[in-house]
Amino acid sequence: MSTELQNTIENNDIRESQMWNSKELKEAIKEIEKMFGKGSIMVLGQSDNLNIETFSSGSLLLDNALGIGGYPKGRIIEIYGPESSGKTTLSLHAICEVQKLGGIAAFIDAEHSLEPKYCQTLGIDTNKLLVSQPDNGEQALDILEMLINSNSIDLIVVDSVAALVPKTELDGEMSDQSIGLQARMMSKALRKLNWLIAKSNTTVIFINQLREKIGVIFGNPETTTGGKALKFFSSIRLEVRKAENILNNYEIIGNKIKIKVVKNKTAIPFKTTTISLLYNKGIDKLGELVDLLVSYEIIEKSGVWYSYQNEKIGQGRTSVIQWLNADENRINELTEQVKKLIKQD
């Protein structure tokens, strides 16, 4: 290292030391904490917020694509896509995972379409799920705010943004113009809710639908409902689309859905994954586990043969699923092993 470069580094270190020991800075920090409370200003490297708290999405493949092992706590998440693409099912799986951890979840059913039996099929304890079916958009957002302010809810799902119709529009005539009412309502609400969500550490999932913009010749004509505020305030945006049917002896038993992480403020964005949703079962968790065990080389695959710790399991993916099903403890141990590897990636 040259003498000139060494002197420059030493001078920078001296200036940095003087800055941190500055009497004026210490007084300013003291005054800020006095006025706004302890923790209102902090050193990022010494902050408790350095490590993002998460909970599983219910899909190991999606947890992997999210980059932090699941959904972040205290953030806004938007899940959008065409109709019948699996958006609500994904959200219900998130509720199930929160309940497994002993947390409390709520579902704001603006579409008035939640099926209790389907929730139970996915593993949700419906006796511990709070549900609201609001009359209009303002009422839904007021209920959302009150639940967040309780500081007792871990996850709230709003289904859907498209169904959050402003009261003015509902009370008016069919011929009345209502351009921009919903967008203004969402923008006003989210400016306030964003801070409350972070403070309460509540995760809020907004389910949204796609619409086509009129007159678009070049570029993508598709857009989400509710204006641009939700796009801005969301930490994660997931685009969900149906990819193909899952067949068993020519019978359709489910769908494969492609998920793209369009926005991610917590990790690398634009990752994609494809997960399987089975009818009356939801996410094919064992199938995902098998794929990840092979991907991380925990289970070895040679041709059609699978083996674990030098012991042959059998031929084909189905034999591995049967091998896992035979021992619940084995499933739990290997799942935890995969989760640790996902967080390390």
From Swiss-Prot:
Keywords tagged on the record: ATP-binding, Cytoplasm, DNA damage, DNA recombination, DNA repair, DNA-binding, Nucleotide-binding, SOS response
Compartments it resides in: Cytoplasm
A Pfam family per the record: RecA
Record-level Gene Ontology MF annotations: ATP binding; ATP hydrolysis activity; ATP-dependent DNA damage sensor activity; damaged DNA binding; single-stranded DNA binding
PROSITE patterns given in the database record: RECA_1, RECA_2, RECA_3
Chain positions recorded as ATP binding sites: 81-88
Record's GO cellular component terms: cytosol
Job of this protein: Can catalyze the hydrolysis of ATP in the presence of single-stranded DNA, the ATP-dependent uptake of single-stranded DNA by duplex DNA, and the ATP-dependent hybridization of homologous single-stranded DNAs. It interacts with LexA causing its activation and leading to its autocatalytic cleavage.
Protein name: Protein RecA
Family according to the record: Belongs to the RecA family.
Disulfide bonds: none
Transmembrane segments: none
GO terms classed as biological process: DNA recombination; DNA repair; SOS response
CDD domains the record matches: RecA (cd00983)
InterPro entries assigned: AAA+_ATPase, DNA_recomb/repair_RecA, DNA_recomb/repair_RecA_CS, P-loop_NTPase, RecA-like_C, RecA-like_N, RecA_ATP-bd, RecA_C_sf
